[in-house]
Structures are given as structure tokens and as C-alpha cells.
Amino acid sequence: DKSTRCVSCIQTSDHRFGATTAEYQILDKFAQKYGWFEIRAKCTRGSGLLNAFWLHQHDPTKQEYTPEGERKNVGDGVVEIDIIELQGRHNAAAGNDVNLNVHFTEKGHFLHHNDFDAADGFHVWAMEWEEGRIAWFCDGDRMEEYIGPTPPGKMFILLALFQYSGWIGDID
């Protein structure tokens, strides 16, 4: 039944945790401030699917969702950088638009159009983060660049394939 919402995903970590959890202690070892972040990936296609590779703020009190599932916003100090968010329904025929976002500022949201279907083959998606600048790349070509304040602290990497209805489309 396509009208039933279904949330499932494959991801590297559950980013909704408290500072005392074992998972938080492990992620602390992999968090960093600034650098080059890269993945070679073949994205999936299909409505209701979201390919995602992103950085999340290291501080568990500043995450987009609380451990109880309540959503916070930019005013609450939430920091997230989307290296790539590609909806499975946005293949070459539907525009192949990639979301590239810096979630702590109103001026850091980009919708970039690529002239290829990301589900047809592997591509290298990357982001360079330095003080005052964040730039996004695909196969070595710069897609977008944000100039302005950058996140003040360490962040950790998350990678996921989500199945969900709503803003990413009804599930096929």
C-alpha cells in the first residue's frame, strides 16, 4: 500500500544518541574539524529513496533530532552539512538535482543540477571544508561553493540510504 508511510534505512550510525552512550564515545574518535570528505558511490533510483552522505555536529545537544525524536532548528544551534542528498526520483529524466546544504545558516542551501544519471555508474562525491569556505565536488568538478561562517566544532561522517515517503516522493 503506497499510502502507508514506511521509514527504513541503511546507514553508518544512528545519530540520535546522548553524550553518555557507547556509540557517542566511539564517534568521538572519528570526529574532525575541517578537511576533505569523499565517497565513490553509485546512487539508487526510485521514488521514496534518498541517497545521503553528510556531516553531523559532534555535540549531541546540538543535533537536528533529540534522542526522543523531537526535531530542532537552526535557532537551536543545529549544525549539519550535507555533502550529497540525492532523491532516487531525481535521475536524469527527472532533473538529477542534488541537495548540498549547510544547515546552520539560511544562505547555505544549494540545489545543483548534474547532466548525468547518478544511478548509471559510480561517481566521486566530495566536499572540502575549511574556515570560511565549503565547496562541493563531483568527479573532480566543483558543483557549488559556500563562503561565510563555517561550523565552529568537530563533526562526524554519516552515510545512508533512506526509504521514506513525504518530501522525497511516494514510495514506488
Residue ranges and their predicted role:
Residues 1-172:
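GH16 jelly-roll
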